[in-house]
Amino acid sequence: MKKTLLGIISLAFLFILAACGSSSADGSQTVKIGVTGSDGDQWPILKEKAKEEGINIELVEFSDYTLPNQALANGEIDMNSFQHIAFLSQYAKENGDTIVPIGSTVIAPIGAYSEKIESLDELKEGDKVAIPDDPSNQARSLRALEAADVIKLADDFGQFGDPSKIVENPKNIEIVPVVAQQTPRVLPDVAVSFINNGIAGQAGLNPKEDPIYLENANDDSITPFVNVFAVNKDDENNETYQKIVELYQDEAVKEAVDKDTSGGSIVVDVPKEELQKHLKRLQEEE
C-alpha cells in the first residue's frame, strides 16, 4: 500500500511539473518559447535575465507563421512570441479560443519597400504590389495603401478585409499576396513589397530608414498590431511565464530591441487585461 501511495504522489508531482514547463535537478525551470526569428541581442539578453531568476529559456524557431500556435496548442512549446493581437484573433476564429495573450512585446509599423521607386506616388499603371498573405497583415497593408491614396477600400472593410474590398484602384495596381517570409525575396519582381519589420531586419533591410512608406505608429487603428507573448488559456496565470513577460520590459532588453531593429520596433507595456479586451473585441467584430 505504501509503495502504491508513493507512486501516486510521484505521478501527481510529475503532472504538476509538466503543467508549468520542465524543471531540472538544480531547481531551475526550462520554458520553451516559439519564435519566427531569433537573430540579434534581445533574446540572449532576455535569456540571461531569466537565468538569474532560475528560468532557462529555450527558443524554438519556426519558418512559417502558421506553426507556432499549432505547436503551442499541441503542447510542444510553453509560450510563443511572434504575433500581434489581430493575427491571434484570426487564429482563434479558425481554431477556437484556446490561446490568450499575457503580455506585450513590441509594436512595429509595417513598411513598404521598393528597389524601383522612391515613393508610392510613383506607382504606375498595372504595377505589382506584394503584401503578406495572412489575413491580418494583408488587411494592414491594404489600409496603408489607402492611407497613401493609392486605393480606396469599402466602408465594411473591417479588421480582416481582403483585396476584394478595394472599391477604387485608379492605377489598376495588381495586389500580389505572398507568404510573409517571402515578401523580401519578391522585391526584384514587384514595384513594392510590404514587409513586416522582423522579416525586414532578417533580410538585411533597415526597417526605419529603408521603407518608402511607413505605417503611422501613433494611429489608434494599429493598436491591434501590438505583438504579444501568448500561452494556452490554462496557463495565463502561470507565475513563471508572467515573470518572463516582466523581464522583457527590462531596459537592457529595450535597448537591444532598438538596436536589433534599427529603431523600427518599440517595446510597449500593455496590461494583460487590455490585450485580452482587444482580442475579444476583434473576435466580436468578425
Task: Go through the PLM ranges and name each one.
Residues 109-120, 224-238, 243:
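A bilobed periplasmic-binding-protein/Venus flytrap-type ligand-binding module shared by bacterial periplasmic
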Residues 15-19:
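C-terminal motif of bacterial Sec signal peptides marking the signal peptidase cleavage site
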Residues 21-23:
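Bacterial signal peptide processing site
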Residues 26-38, 55-61, 127-129:
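Short, well-ordered beta-strand elements
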Residues 29-31, 38-42, 52, 186-190, ...:
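An extracytoplasmic/periplasmic, membrane-proximal ligand-sensing/linker region
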Residues 90-102, 117, 189, 194, ...:
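Ligand-binding "clamshell"
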Residues 102-152:
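A conserved helix-loop-strand patch within extracytoplasmic ligand-binding domains
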Residues 60-70, 157-185:
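Short helix-initiation/N-cap motifs at beta->coil->alpha
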